[in-house]
């Protein structure tokens, strides 16, 4: 069948850290040329959708509407709004995460927040972990924006948000609710955004543990491109095979898939 819509990862798929992936750029340009609906679904919480839009245009030659960018931050806010608890929160994360949550009407509370939200934080320290630990012990709802233990960069694999969240889970003995890929919370909303049936969509990404499992675990066909996290030599040993595997997105045939 020919897919009618695409859910696409960013880091490791369309670009890698600060480095361009020309095949990723060409892939998006072809989607735009063919007027095929797509949504960038990213676990990155360090940037707002507007910041992601600007980065794609300025650094990677991809002009895309902000409405085509769905981050784990937006999915986290949607989830918190659906829960409907008091709008107080303690956030470990970068400005992109904090500002978006505050813009949604949530107020920081370090003592007795209704939520503790943890994403990637380049300046994380012991005191932040201590504050979050005490709040969770008091009953704060523990949310992890995404489970990525590592993130691919031009320097190599670095600790991701999942590494920080795992530390807090160990300290509190409380399991977090994870929002980002591969979890259903973000994928259900992403599918809703496209307005298509799941079998009409393909999830495109470089990380088997997040992107591809997001497809497999949620009934969506998957396309693994081995330009980032998951390496070609690992494909044969994957527990459940992706629907499609490519070494480069230039190999993708839009007319046959």
Regions inferred by a protein language model and the residue ranges of each:
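Asp-based, Mg2+/Mn2+-dependent phosphohydrolase catalytic module
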Residues: 2-8, 15-33, 47-50, 54-70, ...
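Conserved phosphate/oxyanion-binding catalytic-loop motifs
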Residues: 44
């Amino acid at each position: 069948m020919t897919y009618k819509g695409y859910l696409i990862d960013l880091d490791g798929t369309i670009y890698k850290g600060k480095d361009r992936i020309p095949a990723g750029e060409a892939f998006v340009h072809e989607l735009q040329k063919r007027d095929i609906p797509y949504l960038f679904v990213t676990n990155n919480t360090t940037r707002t959708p507007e910041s992601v839009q600007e980065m794609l245009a300025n650094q990677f030659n991809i002009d895309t509407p902000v409405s085509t960018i769905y981050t784990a931050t937006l999915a986290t806010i949607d989830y918190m709004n659906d829960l409907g608890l008091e709008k107080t929160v303690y956030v470990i994360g970068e400005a992109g995460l904090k500002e978006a949550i505050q813009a949604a009407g949530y107020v920081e509370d370090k003592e007795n927040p209704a939520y503790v939200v943890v994403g990637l934080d380049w300046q994380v320290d012991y005191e932040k972990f201590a504050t979050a630990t005490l709040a969770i012990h008091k009953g704060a709802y523990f949310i992890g924006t995404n489970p990525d233990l590592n993130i691919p960069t031009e320097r190599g694999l670095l600790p991701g948000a999942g590494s920080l969240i795992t530390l807090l889970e160990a300290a509190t003995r409380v399991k977090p609710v994870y929002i980002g890929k591969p979890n259903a919370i973000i994928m259900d909303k992403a599918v809703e955004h496209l307005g298509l049936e799941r079998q009409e969509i393909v999830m495109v990404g470089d990380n088997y543990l997040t992107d591809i499992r997001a497809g497999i675990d949620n009934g969506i066909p998957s396309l693994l491109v081995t330009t980032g996290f998951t390496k070609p030599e690992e494909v044969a040993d994957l527990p459940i095979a992706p629907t499609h595997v490519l070494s480069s997105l230039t190999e993708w045939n839009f007319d046959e898939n």
